[in-house]
Amino acid sequence: MKGRIICAIASLLAVASTAYAQKNNDQLGQGSVVVTVVPDHSKEQSVNVTQQDIREIKVDGKDAQVTGFTPLHGANSPVELVFLIDSGARTSLGTQMSEISKFVQEMPPDTRMAIAYMVNGTAAFSGPLSSNPAQVLQALHVTAGPIGISASPYFCLSDLAKHWPSNNRSARRIVVMISDGIDYYDLRYDPEDPYVRAAVDDSVRNGLVVYFLYWADAGRISRMGFEQAAGQNLMLQVTDATGGYSYWQGFGNPVTFQPYLQDLRRRLANQFGLEFTTPLKENNAQIERLNLKLSAPSAKVDAPNRVLVHPASMAQQ
């Protein structure tokens, strides 16, 4: 009888342990982001940072556990890059065609690129992703659309995120937006702009890192300072959320994109894949706030402030 009682207790403990583990597994989330770490001094090409340099990582205000911190470069870290150009920029953007062409031609040979244009709330591609610069540049042309033809650049970004021209989720998905950032459906600055929030959510869900090159549309509205300030601040929300970067010099168009694109190449060469686990409130994928502190005193760190967290059990299925 005593032996039977012991066996029964052992069986109950085993069942309870399994149930507890399953419950905790269901509440455990995991995620990954791209982190950029560039040297403070432009003459230096890279910074030596490791997982041990991560001081703190919090997801939704809770401590997370780092499970991987890997340099992203070489053939084992493919890059897919899309230029998303505002069709309302018109002929004035023609002065930058040579710099865009040079950037495409100088990217590593395993980088797949494409050019899309903002048209009526969509990302309209003129060609497929390709590692052949000549093929990519066939799609590059001076835009000639009317002011506001993009409708909202954030509609276009959402469309691109939801219809990315590849199913390769192991590749870094880089977007280079050329626009004034103005939402023509709401010209004022609204930090809760629903189209911007949707663009952020769609970008985060689909793993996009967004970079913004400010270029003012030709026309009356784009010459008014408060709309320009609104556009820049809205785009800053997108780049901060996705771990990218915003480039501008006041409200005027830059003389050349060359320093921006040079800095972008440097950033792409100094990126790391950060993987982590964290408690998850619900048993489905959630977009949460991310806070990362990295001990790199001689470097600039750009990490997204939003991240998609999946249930660990989902990844195991």
What are these regions (language model features)?
Residues 21-317:
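Scaffold/interface architecture of coatomer-like assemblies
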Residues 1-4:
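Positively charged n-region of N-terminal signal peptides that target proteins for export
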Residues 7-16:
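Bacterial N-terminal signal peptides
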